């Protein structure tokens, strides 16, 4: 029988092996790969991905994602690159980690050479080529809902010209969409996210109307009750006699899975500019409408424990698009975010709350998360989390930084907490 040779430290890992004869020829592409590849390899290894899967996903990133990231961010040159909606520093790449299932996700804002120029002022072009290539690459990627939502939520060429003829728009906040991919079970799960603010400016149609109209056109069976509940909570035009949100809460994103429509979920995102526990609880219970859900109270209790551990200061967050400069630590805190999953699997919109930790001391966040992991039984994660995160940022002192942990998301399904952590790429 064949004798399996043991791996030695001299053998290259997946990142080094794929770098040896890399087809990336552009300087920006090479910088992106050198910056993101080693960290992705470490996170996958720490998540227990098999070696073959590490190769598969690193190759996917190298060949199909890196070419769509545009100019590599350089300090002092923020004006020379696309200002993405995706991250606080307006960088078009974000890595997140579902620590409950140890699944790695990458979000990115597809960019091309024309993005942000007069030839593509709102970065509408690159995503078409990117999604088409991914659909050709993997038969599980289905673009039907992407096309339908794109038609309703992205500005037309005529609307683009109309906006450009107005007073000068800021360069930030112009983005229309971004993508995300989960690396799971040897395959990929692709999602798309739409930002409607430019469509609102161009048409004057309120964002909640844009969203609910787009959802209605998808003709998804058995979600009418959940959609109606969300309308009454979020839209001033609907009323069921129960509390609705105030002007501090507003819609921000609409997302869906790009897969078989029968399995695709819709996610409706909102922002709350007033960060306070009572308001987070209101988002979680949908103004009390979800109290009949058997998972609601148990999830809320755990969310309160996480909130207390993170010790996020309460207050009104003024600017949701702050003018941050890459390389300069943030001096302010950011908003609360929540999304609601709409699917035939539940009569309730299922909430996921994002506690934004950007601007808080990273070591304090590590300690808080470690305590929460211990609380919910993520024993291995509790033991290794601090060491792992320090290895992802070897040149930073996490006792001094306050931007590495961008946010922590929490949901509760099937009697289990689900937690993801979102990391700054720089």
Swiss-Prot record:
Pathway assignment: Alkaloid biosynthesis
Entry binding sites for substrate: 94, 195
Any one GO molecular-function label of the UniProt entry: prenyltransferase activity
Stated regulation of activity: Addition of 5 mM Mg(2+), Ca(2+) or Mn(2+) slightly enhances catalysis (about 100-120%). Significant reduction of enzyme activity (2%-35%) is observed with Cu(2+), Zn(2+), Fe(2+), or Sn(2+) (5 mM).
InterPro entries: Aro_prenylTrfase (IPR033964), Aro_prenylTrfase_DMATS (IPR017795), DMATS-type_fun (IPR012148)
Catalysed reactions listed for this entry: 6-hydroxydeoxybrevianamide E + dimethylallyl diphosphate = notoamide S + diphosphate
Influence of temperature on activity: Optimum temperature is 16 to 42 degrees Celsius.
Keywords from the UniProt entry: Alkaloid metabolism, Prenyltransferase, Transferase
Biotechnology (record note): Notoamides have been shown to exhibit antitumoral activities. Notoamides A-C show moderate cytotoxicity against HeLa and L1210 cells with IC(50) values in the range of 22-52 mg/ml, but the IC(50) value of notoamide D is greater than 100 mg/ml. Moreover, notoamide C induces G2/M-cell cycle arrest at a concentration of 6.3 mg/ml.
Binding site for dimethylallyl diphosphate: 105, 191, 193, 267, 269, 352, 354, 418, 422
Activity response to pH changes: Optimum pH is 6-9.
EC number: 2.5.1.-
Gene Ontology biological process terms from the UniProt entry: alkaloid metabolic process
Purpose of the protein: Prenyltransferase; part of the gene cluster that mediates the biosynthesis of notoamide, a fungal indole alkaloid that belongs to a family of natural products containing a characteristic bicyclo[2.2.2]diazaoctane core. The first step of notoamide biosynthesis involves coupling of L-proline and L-tryptophan by the bimodular NRPS notE, to produce cyclo-L-tryptophan-L-proline called brevianamide F.
Family membership noted in the UniProt record: Belongs to the tryptophan dimethylallyltransferase family.
Family matches, as NCBIfam families: arom_pren_DMATS (TIGR03429)
Name of the protein in question: 6-Hydroxy-7-prenyldeoxybrevianamide E synthase notC
Source species: Aspergillus sp. (strain MF297-2)
Gene: notC
């Amino acid at each position: 029988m064949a004798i399996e040779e043991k791996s030695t430290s001299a053998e290259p890992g997946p990142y080094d092996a794929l770098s040896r004869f890399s087809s990336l020829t552009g300087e920006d592409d090479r910088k992106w790969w050198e910056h993101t590849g080693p960290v992705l390899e470490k996170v996958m290894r720490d998540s227990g991905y098999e070696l073959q899967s590490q190769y598969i996903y690193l190759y996917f990133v190298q060949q199909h994602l890196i070419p769509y990231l545009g100019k590599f961010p350089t300090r002092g040159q923020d004006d020379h690159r696309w200002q993405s909606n995706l991250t606080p520093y307006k960088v078009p790449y974000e890595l997140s980690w579902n620590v409950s299932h140890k699944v790695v996700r990458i979000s990115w804002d597809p960019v091309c050479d024309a993005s942000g120029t007069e030839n593509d002022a709102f970065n509408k072009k690159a995503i078409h080529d990117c999604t088409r290539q991914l659909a050709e690459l993997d038969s599980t990627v289905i673009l039907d809902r992407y096309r339908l939502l794109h038609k309703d939520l992205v500005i037309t060429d005529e609307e683009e010209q109309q906006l450009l003829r107005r007073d000068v728009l800021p360069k930030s906040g112009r983005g229309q969409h971004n993508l995300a991919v989960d690396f799971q079970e040897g395959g990929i799960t692709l999602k798309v996210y739409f930002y409607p603010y430019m469509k609102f400016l161009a048409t004057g149609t309120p964002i909640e109307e844009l969203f609910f109209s787009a959802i209605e056109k998808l003709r998804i069976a058995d979600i009418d009750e959940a959609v109606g509940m969300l309308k009454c909570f979020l839209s001033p035009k609907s009323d069921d006699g129960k509390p609705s949100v105030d002007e501090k809460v507003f819609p921000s994103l609409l997302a869906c899975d790009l897969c078989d429509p029968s399995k695709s979920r819709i996610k409706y995102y909102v922002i709350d500019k007033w960060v306070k526990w009572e308001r987070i609880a209101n988002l979680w219970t949908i103004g009390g409408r979800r109290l009949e859900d058997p998972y609601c109270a148990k999830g809320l209790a755990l969310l309160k424990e996480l909130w207390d551990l993170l010790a996020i200061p309460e207050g009104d967050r003024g600017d949701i698009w702050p003018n941050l400069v890459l390389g300069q630590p943030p001096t302010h805190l950011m908003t609360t975010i929540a999304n609601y999953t709409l699917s035939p699997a539940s009569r309730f919109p299922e909430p996921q709350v994002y506690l934004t930790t950007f601007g808080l001391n990273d070591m304090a966040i590590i300690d808080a998360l470690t305590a929460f992991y211990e609380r919910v039984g993520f024993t291995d994660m509790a033991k290794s989390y601090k060491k792992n995160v320090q290895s992802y940022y070897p040149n930073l002192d996490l006792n001094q930084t306050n931007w590495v942990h961008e946010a922590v998301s929490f949901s509760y399904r099937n009697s289990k907490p689900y937690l993801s952590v979102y990391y700054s790429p720089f």
